[in-house]
């Protein structure tokens, strides 16, 4: 595109058919194209549609099975699981030699139990596989027989596993089948997953290639091989096992059932980290995410979430733009994509399901009838769905008054008529507080967003700093641990550049933070600043704790950088020219946390009609009883839920008692209820799984 020359061109490979659809706007055009293109959904689409997604890249088999069972007890069963890291030699290494499962993550029986836990809950589980990257140390590797070549006779390089120093090469499409079928027969007999995930095939386009002896193979052949193998796996596993891939282009619709979205933003790289690149860096006056792909394919190709969290946030603060943020969830609602989470269990996991899942189930397999940019504003979008469903999304900075609601930035309102009644969900501003609500015929979820600190009460700080000369520094640290140091975690001290990338690390004695230690813990750390760091540069020290077994970081107290690292301060290399005079230290000065503007720090009770509370809980009917289930988190403060009995969506007899229940259904105690008119206050304890209100 050359706008200054008024020149725009489209390019396609090989023999192509172009279809032009004239219409008053693109949304009318895409409706016509959707109705007439003849594309049919693959066999597993009906099974994948609408399902919440556990997208799991780390963790051990046994512990993850236990965590998923907890999630299922909280009702998170209209779902599917993507299990990515399990391959025999580790993730993305020595492919295609992937079976049996990696013993470093647990036993074969534990892996089978993980799959059984999902099957018992009616939750499909997919295992991650890859037939793009062939590693030279894998059995059967041969440039001549298996690897694609460029026109000039050089092999096509594929993924570089930097952590293990291993370069892979791209498969010839005509040589994938024997390796894939060998693996799938082993996996079906040994593990029996109920879904399957193949990486890259719907993020990279089908490719042309040459063989080692100079034969040309076009991309249409590659596409037919990929598609045919997806269909073969679905038949082999049985039960219309959904086939899932990465990102989700439209070239495999009819064979492939869905993909994990990567819905990037348009704009220049900003923020920090290695995923600053994850944007469409196109200069333009304005831009916004919009449901273009789903307008064409929502009912025949199931996209999950809004993207892997690091790619979606693209260098921005994960708390404000990551997978559990209002920004991310509003994009899921805008597109009608099932919610996606990165953990098997947790407060945010349950919260996201309770807020979004009834809505996503109601939108599953519907079609988009139109998208309006209200008053010409790209950031205020109104999406009309088949069957009378309506969604309003505000991604602009100013509040938007619409359909009786006040939508803040990254707020939404959705109303979907169903046979069982109206399904409604929202993130809205209510009396100055941003809150969450979702209701359907069977459930009512509310969240007054009282602040619940996800951090462990462990906070690091620097007590003293010393420049020891010769580019060596010494830090005296104090770790205030109000709870015991957890098992399996180790401290880290990163010195980072302005993008948050690690340039070098300081070391401290790991025994100082041995598991079980508590109180004020002193430690000394040292570091040598590399010669590549020039005089005049400033670097930031960020500290935290991580699990060497899987890389997960703990959330700690202090000024978090959005990646679970606490900002402690900066060092600066002072001097003139290339001559270093000294290394100086400046403590970090915390700024107001922008996340608090989206929460309820004063814990003001919010009136949701049938219930008033600053807490977060779901109401369900159980016969003549009412069950209140708080969001899980034993470290969260208790809260009061004031029920207005006559305004509940169900006609229930007035209760006389409340019984607190454990996760396994055991009674934790009973107490009498006292009504004030039609209102009754219930004290919700974080130590209880649920509170059941009954008449006896």
Located regions from the model:
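Active-site-proximal substrate-binding groove within the catalytic cores of carbohydrate-active enzymes
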Residues: 1-20, 52-62, 151-154, 159, ...
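Aromatic-lined carbohydrate-binding/catalytic grooves of carbohydrate-active enzymes
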Residues: 38-179, 189-195, 203-211
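Short solvent-exposed strand-capping/beta-turn motif centered on an Asx-Ser/Thr pair
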Residues: 397, 480-486, 498, 633, ...
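Solvent-exposed beta-strand/loop surfaces of large extracellular or lumenal domains
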Residues: 422-426, 499-516, 659-678
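Extracellular/lumen-exposed scaffold segments
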Residues: 454-602
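Extended low-complexity, serine/threonine- and proline-enriched intrinsically disordered segments
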Residues: 490-500, 643-647, 655-663
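Short, aromatic- and glycine-rich surface loops/edge beta-strands on solvent-exposed regions
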Residues: 537-545, 658, 689-696
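Proteolytic cleavage junctions
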Residues: 669-696
């Amino acid at each position: 595109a050359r706008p200054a020359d008024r020149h725009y061109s489209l390019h396609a490979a090989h023999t192509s058919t172009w279809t032009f659809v004239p219409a008053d706007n693109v949304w009318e055009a895409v409706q016509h194209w959707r109705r007439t293109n003849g594309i049919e959904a693959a066999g597993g689409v009906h099974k994948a549609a609408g399902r919440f997604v556990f997208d799991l890249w780390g963790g051990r088999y046994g512990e993850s099975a236990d965590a998923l069972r907890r999630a299922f007890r909280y009702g998170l069963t209209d779902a599917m699981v993507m299990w990515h890291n399990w391959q025999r030699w580790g993730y993305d290494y020595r492919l295609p030699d992937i079976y049996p499962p990696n013993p470093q993550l647990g036993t074969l029986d534990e892996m089978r139990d993980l799959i059984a836990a999902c099957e018992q809950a009616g939750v499909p589980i997919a295992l991650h596989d890859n037939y793009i990257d062939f590693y030279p140390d894998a059995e059967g590797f041969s440039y001549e027989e298996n690897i694609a070549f460029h026109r000039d006779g050089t092999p096509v390089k594929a993924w570089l596993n930097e952590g293990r120093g291993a370069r892979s090469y791209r498969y010839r499409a005509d040589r994938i089948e024997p390796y894939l079928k060998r693996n799938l027969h082993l996996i079906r007999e040994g593990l029996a997953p109920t879904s399957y995930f193949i990486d890259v095939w719907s993020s990279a386009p089908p490719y042309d290639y040459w063989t080692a002896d100079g034969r040309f193979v076009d991309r249409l052949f590659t596409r037919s091989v990929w598609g045919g193998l997806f269909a073969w796996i679905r038949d082999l596993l049985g039960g219309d096992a959904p086939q899932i891939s990465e990102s989700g282009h439209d070239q495999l619709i009819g064979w492939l059932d869905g993909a994990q979205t990567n819905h990037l933003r348009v704009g220049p790289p900003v923020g920090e980290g290695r995923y600053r690149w994850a944007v469409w860096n196109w200069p333009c006056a304005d831009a916004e995410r919009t449901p273009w792909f789903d307008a064409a394919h929502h009912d025949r190709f199931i996209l999950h979430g809004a993207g892997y969290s690091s790619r979606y946030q693209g260098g921005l603060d994960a708390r404000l733009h990551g997978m559990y943020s209002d920004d991310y969830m509003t994009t899921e609602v805008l597109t009608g994509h099932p919610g996606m989470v990165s953990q098997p269990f947790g407060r945010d996991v349950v919260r996201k399901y309770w807020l979004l899942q009834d809505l996503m189930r109601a939108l599953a397999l519907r079609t988009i009838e139109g998208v309006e940019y209200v008053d010409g504003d790209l950031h205020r979008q109104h999406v009309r769905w088949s069957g009378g469903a309506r969604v309003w999304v505000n991604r602009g900075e100013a509040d938007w008054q619409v359909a009786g609601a006040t939508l803040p930035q990254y707020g939404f309102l959705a109303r979907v008529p169903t046979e069982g009644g109206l399904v409604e969900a929202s993130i809205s501003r209510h009396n100055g507080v941003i809150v969450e609500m979702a209701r359907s015929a069977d459930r009512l979820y509310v969240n007054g967003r009282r602040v619940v600190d996800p951090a462990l009460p462990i906070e690091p700080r620097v007590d003293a700093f010393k420049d020891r000369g010769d580019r060596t520094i010494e830090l005296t640290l104090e770790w205030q641990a109000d709870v015991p140091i957890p098992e399996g975690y180790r401290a880290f001290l990163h010195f980072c550049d302005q993008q948050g990338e690690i340039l070098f690390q300081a070391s401290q004695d790991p025994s100082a933070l041995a598991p079980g230690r508590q109180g004020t813990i002193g430690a000394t750390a040292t570091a040598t600043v590399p010669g590549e760091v020039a005089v005049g540069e400033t670097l930031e020290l960020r500290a935290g704790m991580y699990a060497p077994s899987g890389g997960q970081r703990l959330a700690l107290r202090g000024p978090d950088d959005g990646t679970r690292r606490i900002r402690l301060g900066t060092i600066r290399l002072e001097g003139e020219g290339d001559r270093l005079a000294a290394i100086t230290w400046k403590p970090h000065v915390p700024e107001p946390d922008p996340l608090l503007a989206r929460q309820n720090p004063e814990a003001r009770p919010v009136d949701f009609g049938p219930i008033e509370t600053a807490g977060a809980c779901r109401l369900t009917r159980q016969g003549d009883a009412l069950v209140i289930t708080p969001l899980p988190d034993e470290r969260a403060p208790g809260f009061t839920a004031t029920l207005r009995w006559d305004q509940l969506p169900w006609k229930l007899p007035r209760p006389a008692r409340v019984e607190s229940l454990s996760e396994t259904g055991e009674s934790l105690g009973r107490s009498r209820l006292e009504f004030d008119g039609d209102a009754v206050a219930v004290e919700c304890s974080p130590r209880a799984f649920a509170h059941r209100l009954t008449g006896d």
